[in-house]
UniProtKB/Swiss-Prot annotation:
Protein name: UvrABC system protein A
Protein origin, superkingdom: Bacteria
Keyword tags: ATP-binding, Cytoplasm, DNA damage, DNA excision, DNA repair, DNA-binding, Excision nuclease, Metal-binding, Nucleotide-binding, Repeat, SOS response, Zinc, Zinc-finger
Gene3D superfamilies, per the entry: ABC transporter ATPase domain-like, ABC transporter ATPase like domain, ATP-grasp fold, A domain, P-loop containing nucleotide triphosphate hydrolases
Record-linked InterPro entries: ABC_transporter-like_ATP-bd, ABC_transporter-like_CS, ATP_grasp_subdomain_1, P-loop_NTPase, UvrA, UvrA_DNA-bd, UvrA_inter
Subunit comment: Forms a heterotetramer with UvrB during the search for lesions.
Cellular compartments per GO CC: cytoplasm; excinuclease repair complex
One record GO biological process: SOS response
Main subcellular localisation: cytoplasm
Residue ranges constituting the ABC transporter domain according to the UniProt record: 310-587, 607-937
PROSITE patterns: ABC_TRANSPORTER_1, ABC_TRANSPORTER_2
Reported function: The UvrABC repair system catalyzes the recognition and processing of DNA lesions. UvrA is an ATPase and a DNA-binding protein. A damage recognition complex composed of 2 UvrA and 2 UvrB subunits scans DNA for abnormalities. When the presence of a lesion has been verified by UvrB, the UvrA molecules dissociate.
Binding residues annotated for ATP, in chain numbering: 31-38, 640-647
Length: 947
C-alpha cells in the first residue's frame, strides 16, 4: 500500500475527518494550538499503530506494557508499527545520562574492557601479568657482563621484628637477604625495630648477564615467584642507584602489589555494583543537610527563628536549645551570626563528647533532667529523615537537603579500579566529560595498532555513528555524562531521535512532537536533514510542527483548524506547501505566503538608563564570568545557539536569585555569581513555564485561575441554597457533601483491565456529572453547577456578564486565546502551550503593581504563527503596565518584536558562555560574530503584507 487511509476520526475534538496520507514521506501536521494536531498524530495514528502491534503479542506480554486507549475512528488502513518520540517522556532517573540513553556508554564499556590498559592508581605503572619466559628475555637483553641479583620480596612495608620469617628463610638454605635496602647475611641478621615498617627481599640468585643463562634464570625466577607470591626484583649489584627491574606474574603493580580482576564491561557501569563507586552508589553526588538551607535567617536569634522549626513555637526543640545556651553561656535572643563560631558549630553539628544537662518539661508541667551530648540540628534532621516512616516528615526535611559531588569518585560515578583504565592515555570519565563534538573528533583521531585495532574496529564504528547522529540533531554541546533529568524536553526528544536513526529501522511510522523546540535556526537545517534521512531509510515520518522551515521541507502538509478546541478538528488544507499557501481558509498558508505576518513595532520602547537590572560575574556551567544588563520595564529576549548558556544565565542564576530575594524562596541554590544590582525595582518574580497547571484530573482552568470559588459562592447565594443551608463547599467536587460519593467527584470510574488498557466508564449514579442529585437541583440562571463547568470560556463570559469579578477573569482567558476550552476541562488534557496561557491569564487578571519581573522559557513551544501573535499582544500588554519581561527564545518572530536582545555564544557548550552583543534588534542584527544576527537581519528587512 502506498497510503495510510483514515476514515471517520473523532478522537477528542476531531470532527469525523477522512484523510489519505502518503507512506514513506515526511508529513508535517500543523495548525493552531489546540486545533487537534496531537489528537490526529498521537492519539489516533500512533495509538492505533501501537495498539495493533501490541495486540499481536500474547496476553501475558501485554500486561507489562502500558497500552493506549483505542482511538475513536471508523477505519485506518496501511498503518506500520509506530514509534512516538515526544517531549514529555524525559527520564527522571538520576542514573540516566546522555551516554546511557544513546547506548554510547555501553559501547564505551565494551571498548575499555577489551582494549583498555589498567594502571596502578598510586604509581601510574601499567598492570600486566608477565610469563617467566618474558622475564628471562628481559634480563638476558641487559648489557653482557652486568652483575645482577634476583630478589623475592617476602615482606613489604610491614611493622614487626619478623624474626620467624628470617629464621625460616635461613632454614630453607637461603644465604642472603636485602633488608630495608641493605644486603645482609641471614646467619646473622640485624635486629629489627618492632614499631618500624620493614621490607625483606630474599636473594634467590646472583649472576653475570650471559646468553647461556636462560635455563638457570627460568628456574630461579620460578623459585622467586613462588616465594613472593608472584613478584620478583632484579637489582644491580655494583650500583644501587641504577633503576631496578620489577616483574609480576600476577595482574598487579610490581611496586605495591595493587591488582585487578580481569577487565569486563560491567566494571565500567555505574549502574552495576561491580563498577559503581561504593560511596555514592554510582550517582556521582552525595546528599547532605545543607547548613545554608537550614539556617534560613542567620541575622535572627535562635528564639526568633534563625532555624525553622527550632524556635520558641516548637517547645520540645526550643527547650533543648535553651539548655544548650545555659551550658555554653550564650544569649538565645542574640542574632545567630553574632554568636561565637564554636557555639554555632555546637548548635549545628553537636557538642561532641561534651555532656549537657537537658531539662525536659512534659504536658503536665513535670520537669525531667537528663545528661547527654547534643547531637546537633543537622545530625538530628539526618537521623529523623532516615528513621521516619511518614512521607510528610520526609518531604518537609528534604527541603534542607543539597547535593555535593562525591568526594571518593569526584562525581565520575565509577569505582577506583575503573577510573584507572586507559585507552590512548584517556580514561572513561575523561571521555564522558568531553562534549559530543569533541568526543567525535577524539574517536576519529584514535590510532590503535595491531590486535587492539582489530578488536576495537566495530566498537569504534558504532560509537562514531551515534556521536555523528547527535551532532546532526544539534546536540554537539552536550557531554555524555550529562544527567538526563537536566535535559530540556527538546534536547531529550532529539537524543531519542538520534538513537532511532542509530537503530536503522525500516518500514516504521515515526510520530514526532515539535523536534525543533530549543533549537537555534542555525541547527534547524541539520535536524531537517536527519528527518529526511529517516524518511529515506524507508519510514513514514509524521511531525507535529509549527516551524516555517520544517513546513517548507515537508513532502505533504496537513493543516488542522480553522480554530482551536470546538472550533477546530477539521482538515482545512492538505497537500504540498504550495497547495497550503493557495488555500484561502488556511491561516498557516496566509502566514507562509506573507499575506499575514507578525509586524515589527514601528517604534521600539526605549530604555531608561537609570533603571537597569545588572547581574555581575555569572560563572555557572559554561558561563565565562559574564555581566548581564537588562533594562527595567522592557520586553527583553535572550538568544543564542543551543547550549550557549541562556538557561544557566536566566533560569539557574537570575531567576533563582530573584526568587530568593523577592519571593523569599529557599529551595533553589543560584548558580555562582558575584553581585546583583537593581532588584529594588521589583516586588516579585514570576516564572511562567509550560509545566501542567495540575497533575490530576481534578485540576482545571476554573480552579487554577480562581474562577471556581466565586462561582460556588454564587450558587450558595441563590434562594434554593439558602433554604437548604448549602455553603460554597457544597458545590466542590473535592470534598464530601455535594459531590457524588460513588465516583468521589471524578465523574468516571476506573476499571482495571490488566492486559488490556484501563478503561474509564461514566459513573452510573451521577452519569458523569460529578455531583449528587440534590446539588444539581440548585440552579443559577437556569443552569446547574455541572452545566456551568461544561461551558466554554466564551459561553461562560456571556453567562456571567453581570458579575464583574468573574467577567474580568474570563475575559483575560479569551485575551490569551483560550475562548474554546471548557471551564471544567481536566488540566491533564491541556497542551503545554494552553497550560502556559492559563498561567498568563491568571497573571493578567491580577491587579498589577507594574513592578513584576516575568521570566518565560521558550513560550512559543506548541504555538502557531497566529497564537504567537496573540501571545506577543499579551506580553506587550504586561510590559505596558510597567512590568519587565525576560524571554528565552529562538523564534525569530518574537525576537524581532523585542525591545532589547542579549545574544549569547558564539557556540554551544565550552565554545559558548559569553555575551556577544546586547541592544535593540537592529543593533544585534549587525553583529558579525552572532549566529542569531545572520538570521535576524533578513527578517528585519522583510516587507510585511498585512491584511
Amino acid at each position: 500500500m502506498d497510503n495510510i487511509e483514515v476514515r471517520g476520526a473523532r478522537t477528542h475534538n476531531l470532527k469525523n475527518i477522512n484523510l489519505i496520507i502518503p507512506r514513506d514521506k515526511l508529513i508535517v501536521v500543523t495548525g493552531l494550538s489546540g486545533s487537534g494536531k496531537s489528537s490526529l498524530a498521537f492519539d489516533t495514528l500512533y495509538a492505533e499503530g501501537q495498539r495493533r502491534y501490541v495486540e499481536s503479542l500474547s496476553a501475558y506480554a501485554r500486561q507489562f506494557l502500558s497500552l493506549m486507549e483505542k482511538p475513536d475512528v471508523d477505519h485506518i488502513e496501511g498503518l506500520s508499527p509506530a514509534i512516538s518520540i515526544e517531549q514529555k517522556s524525559t527520564s527522571h532517573n538520576p542514573r540516566s545520562t546522555v551516554g546511557t540513553i544513546t547506548e554510547i556508554h555501553d559501547y564505551l564499556r565494551l571498548l575499555f574492557a577489551r582494549v583498555g590498559e589498567p594502571r596502578c592508581p598510586d604509581h601510574d605503572v601499567p598492570l600486566a601479568a608477565q610469563t617467566v619466559s618474558q622475564m628471562v628475555d628481559n634480563v638476558i637483553s641487559q648489557p653482557e657482563g652486568r652483575r645482577l641479583m634476583l630478589l623475592a620480596p617476602v615482606v613489604k612495608d610491614r611493622k614487626g621484628e619478623h624474626t620467624k620469617i628470617l629464621e625460616n628463610l635461613a632454614a630453607q638454605g637461603y644465604i642472603r637477604a636485602r633488608i630495608d635496602g641493605e644486603v645482609c647475611d641471614l646467619s646473622d641478621p640485624p635486629k629489627l625495630e618492632l614499631q618500624k615498617k620493614h621490607t625483606i627481599e630474599v636473594v634467590v640468585d646472583r649472576f653475570k648477564v650471559r646468553e647461556d643463562l636462560a635455563q638457570r634464570l627460568a628456574e630461579s625466577f620460578e623459585t622467586a615467584l613462588a616465594l613472593s607470591g608472584g613478584t620478583a626484583v632484579v637489582a644491580d649489584m655494583d650500583d644501587p642507584h641504577v633503576e631496578e627491574l620489577l616483574f609480576s606474574a600476577n595482574f598487579a603493580c610490581p611496586i605495591c602489589g595493587y591488582s585487578m580482576r580481569e577487565l569486563e564491561p560491567r566494571l565500567f557501569s555505574f549502574n552495576n555494583p561491580a563498577g559503581a563507586c561504593p560511596t555514592c552508589d554510582g550517582l556521582g553526588v552525595q546528599q547532605f543537610f545543607d547548613p545554608d538551607r537550614v539556617l534560613q535567617n542567620p541575622e535572627l536569634s535562635l528564639a526568633g527563628g534563625a532555624i525553622r522549626g527550632w524556635d520558641r513555637r516548637n517547645f520540645y526543640y526550643f527547650q533543648m536549645l535553651r539548655s544548650l545556651a545555659e551550658h555554653y553561656k550564650f544569649d538565645i535572643e542574640a542574632p545567630f551570626n553574632s554568636l561565637d563560631s564554636a557555639v554555632q558549630q555546637a548548635v549545628l553539628y553537636g557538642s561532641g563528647k561534651d555532656t549537657i544537662e537537658f531539662k525536659y518539661i512534659n504536658d503536665r508541667g513535670d520537669t525531667t533532667v537528663r545528661r547527654h551530648p547534643f547531637e546537633g540540628v543537622l545530625h538530628n534532621m539526618e537521623r529523623r529523615y532516615k528513621e521516619t516512616e511518614s512521607s510528610a516528615v520526609r518531604e518537609e526535611l528534604a527541603k534542607f537537603i543539597s547535593n555535593r559531588s562525591c568526594a571518593s569518585c569526584s562525581g565520575t560515578r565509577l569505582r577506583r579500579e575503573a577510573r584507572y583504565v586507559f585507552v590512548e592515555n584517556t580514561t572513561l570519565p575523561e571521555i564522558s566529560e568531553l562534549s559530543i563534538g569533541h568526543a567525535l573528533s577524539f574517536f576519529q583521531n584514535m590510532k590503535l595498532s595491531g590486535q587492539r585495532a582489530q578488536i576495537a574496529e566495530k566498537i569504534l564504528k558504532e560509537i562514531g555513528d551515534r556521536l555523528k547522529f547527535l551532532v546532526n540533531v544539534g546536540l554537539n554541546y552536550l557531554s555524555l555524562s550529562r544527567s538526563a533529568e537536566t535535559l530540556s524536553g527538546g534536547e531529550a526528544q532529539r537524543i531519542r531521535l538520534a538513537s532511532q536513526i542509530g537503530a536503522g529501522l525500516v518500514g516504521v511510522m515515526y510520530v514526532l512532537d515539535e523536534p525543533s523546540i530549543g533549537l537555534h535556526q542555525r541547527d534547524n537545517e541539520r535536524l531537517l536533514e536527519t528527518l529526511i534521512h529517516l524518511r529515506n531509510l524507508g519510514n513514514t515520518v509524521i511531525v507535529v510542527e509549527h516551524d516555517e522551515d520544517a513546513i517548507r521541507a515537508a513532502d505533504h502538509v496537513i493543516d488542522i483548524g480553522p480554530g482551536a478546541g470546538v472550533h477546530g478538528g477539521e482538515v482545512v488544507a492538505e497537500g504540498t506547501v504550495d497547495d497550503i499557501m493557495a488555500a484561502p481558509a488556511s491561516l498557516t498558508g496566509q502566514f507562509l505566503s506573507g499575506k499575514r505576518s507578525i509586524a515589527i513595532p514601528e517604534k521600539r520602547v526605549s530604555a531608561d538608563p537609570s533603571k537597569v537590572l545588572k547581574l555581575i560575574g555569572a560563572t555557572g556551567n559554561n558561563l565565562k564570568d559574564v555581566t548581564l544588563t537588562l533594562p527595567v520595564g522592557l520586553f527583553s529576549c535572550i538568544t543564542g545557539v543551543s547550549g550557549s548558556g541562556k538557561s544557566t544565565l536566566i533560569n539557574d542564576t537570575l531567576y533563582s536569585i530573584a526568587q530568593r530575594q523577592l519571593n523569599g524562596a529557599t529551595i533553589t541554590e543560584p548558580a555562582p555569581y558575584r553581585e546583583i544590582q537593581g532588584l529594588e525595582h521589583f516586588d516579585k518574580v514570576i516564572d511562567i513555564d509550560q509545566s501542567p497547571i495540575g497533575r490530576t484530573p481534578r485540576s482545571n482552568p476554573a480552579t487554577y485561575t480562581g474562577i471556581f470559588t466565586p462561582i460556588r459562592e454564587l450558587f450558595a447565594g441563590v434562594p434554593e441554597s439558602r433554604t437548604r443551608g448549602y455553603t460554597p463547599g457544597r458545590f466542590s467536587f473535592n470534598v464530601k457533601g455535594g459531590r457524588c460519593e460513588a465516583c468521589q467527584g471524578d465523574g468516571v470510574i476506573k476499571v482495571e483491565m490488566h492486559f488490556l488498557p484501563d478503561i474509564y466508564v461514566p459513573c452510573d449514579h451521577c452519569k458523569g456529572k460529578r455531583y449528587n442529585r440534590e446539588t444539581l437541583e440548585v440552579k443559577y440562571k437556569g443552569k446547574s453547577i455541572h452545566e456551568v463547568l461544561a461551558m466554554t470560556i466564551e459561553e461562560a463570559r456571556e453567562f456571567f456578564d453581570a458579575v464583574p469579578a468573574l467577567a474580568r477573569k474570563l475575559q483575560t482567558l479569551i485575551d490569551v486565546g483560550l475562548s474554546y476550552i471548557c471551564l471544567g476541562q481536566s488540566a491533564t488534557t491541556l497542551s503545554g502551550g494552553e497550560a502556559q496561557r492559563v498561567k498568563l491569564s491568571r497573571e493578567l487578571s491580577k491587579r498589577g503593581t507594574g513592578q513584576t519581573l516575568y521570566i518565560l522559557d521558550e513560550p512559543t513551544t506548541g504555538l502557531h504563527f497566529a497564537d504567537i501573535q496573540q501571545l506577543l499582544a499579551v506580553l506587550h500588554q504586561l510590559r505596558d503596565q510597567g512590568n519587565t519581561i525576560v524571554v528565552i527564545e529562538h523564534n525569530l518572530d518574537v525576537i524581532k518584536t523585542a525591545d532589547w536582545i542579549v545574544d549569547l555564544g558564539p557556540e554551544g557548550g565550552s565554545g559558548g558562555g559569553e555575551i556577544l552583543v546586547s541592544g535593540t534588534p537592529e543593533t544585534v542584527a549587525e553583529c558579525a560574530a552572532s549566529h542569531t544576527a545572520r538570521f535576524l537581519k533578513p527578517m528585519l528587512q522583510r516587507k510585511p503584507q498585512t491584511v
